Amino acid sequence: FREAFVRIWSERVVNDEFNALVLGAELSWREVVVFRAYAKYNHQVKFGFGTTYTAETLARHVHIVSLLAAYFRTRFGLEIANRQGELARLEREILSALDQVPSLNEDRVLRRFLELMNATLRTNYCQGADQDAKSYLSFKFDPAKITAMPLPRPAYEIFVYSPRME
């Protein structure tokens, strides 16, 4: 929490609704940036839900957000033992939790994060520790794995998120 507060106060991290995940889902400031970046990408490809609604949905389902964060760390972390087995276990747990979400729109928002994580081929997230983290986050996507992606779909897409570019 302290590191997130310092970064928000010093305006190195955006101060918005996504920061509720620091306390609610016990995420680090960098993990919150991952969710914010995916939400901004959703906005760019006209997914249909605004970033405020997305942030509010995430805040209402912090257990699922915690599972999604663990999924992301497992998918892209360095030196993860039994990566495929752990990803399969986490995905089953996420899908089971999603079955309990009463709102169809909230279900779509939450499933979209899992879909985007699975469509992400590469990211710079793991380059450097928290204090050495880059000021931007980049993803390389396989658009064929993203439903409702506007046509024409490129073979690959690079998305860079930075608070300085907003």
Residue ranges: model-predicted function:
Residues F1-E166:
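Extended, well-ordered protein cores
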